[in-house]
Design a protein with these regions (language model features):
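Alpha/beta enzyme core
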Residues: 1-33, 49-70, 74-209, 215-233
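Short glycine/proline- and acidic residue-enriched helix-loop micro-motifs
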Residues: 36-45, 182
């Protein structure tokens, strides 16, 4: 369809750690005691050996496409899961995206400790692999620019702006918490655009990748004009289908022709 690379669905820290505990002889009850919030998720998605399934996905993907295949790990702290990064590399992943999602709801937690944990997680992963590692950030930091610089100094080859927490909702008839909208809205693109512009103007020494709320070829053009090296799309493909990538590329090429650009580099901000 014309994509330049594929980022696979994230494998979650809880999936990896629970699989390791199974191998070490822990019971299901022990695992759920350790990860109570993940019980429903694990019951639904743990079919066979989750790590092996993910590695198989990498290998099979490499066989059918000639573009980079990027593995993704969703994590919130350092743990046993880190050693699995090497296995994903060995399975053929061309790069790794760390989708770090630390929920800061503890009022006693020093905000600086959160940023230090991001750096620490990245460094531990970097020790185990030699493929490029990018970090996917949230937008709720006091100083995103400083964190971005510190992550690049710690070895990040790319920064992805931004990740997205699953949003809760409440069913007022059943008076229960339910899952909210799981895909991004086009309006979310504007915040990404702001921060891509700000960080690119500061010459962050790594690639900047725009994510969240990118729905059209026009959205992609805006992000590149702002300074993004790459642009990620997901929600629009759920809504419009994988083949929509062709339309987005066609729209970008038509715009480039109108403005006499021969290469994407010619109009990157």
């Amino acid at each position: 369809a014309g994509a330049g690379a594929v980022i696979l669905k994230s494998i979650f820290e809880e999936q990896i750690s629970s699989e390791i505990k199974r191998e070490e002889g822990y019971s299901e009850e022990d695992i759920y005691d350790a990860y109570p919030e993940a019980q429903e998720y694990l019951n639904t998605f743990m079919r066979g050996t989750e790590i092996e399934i993910y590695e198989k996905l990498i290998r099979e993907s490499k066989k059918v496409v000639d573009i980079p295949i990027i593995a993704s790990i969703n994590c919130s702290d350092k743990g046993e899961w880190i050693r699995i990064a090497k296995e994903l590399q060995d399975a053929g992943a061309d790069a790794l995206e760390l989708n770090i999602a630390i929920a800061a709801f503890d009022r006693d937690l020093d905000p600086r400790k959160i940023e230090e944990e991001y750096i620490s997680i990245l460094k531990e992963v970097e020790k185990n692999i030699n493929i490029p590692v990018s970090v996917k950030l949230g937008d709720h930091f006091t100083n995103i620019s400083r964190l971005a610089f510190n992550l690049t100094k710690a070895g990040a080859k790319g920064l992805v702006l931004f990740n997205r927490f699953y949003n809760p909702d409440i069913n007022i008839e059943k008076m229960k918490v339910v899952t909210g909208n799981s895909i991004s809205a086009p309006e979310e693109n504007h915040n990404t655009l702001r921060w891509i512009s700000l960080l690119s103007s500061q010459e962050i020494p790594c690639e900047l990748s725009a994510s969240r709320g990118v729905y059209t070829g026009e959205d992609v053009i805006k992000q590149i004009l702002a300074g993004a090296q790459t642009v990620q799309v997901c929600s629009t493909l759920y809504r419009n289908g994988i083949e929509y990538v062709k339309q987005m590329n066609a729209d970008i090429e038509a715009w480039m022709d109108r403005h006499n650009f021969d290469n994407v580099k010619d109009f990157r901000g």
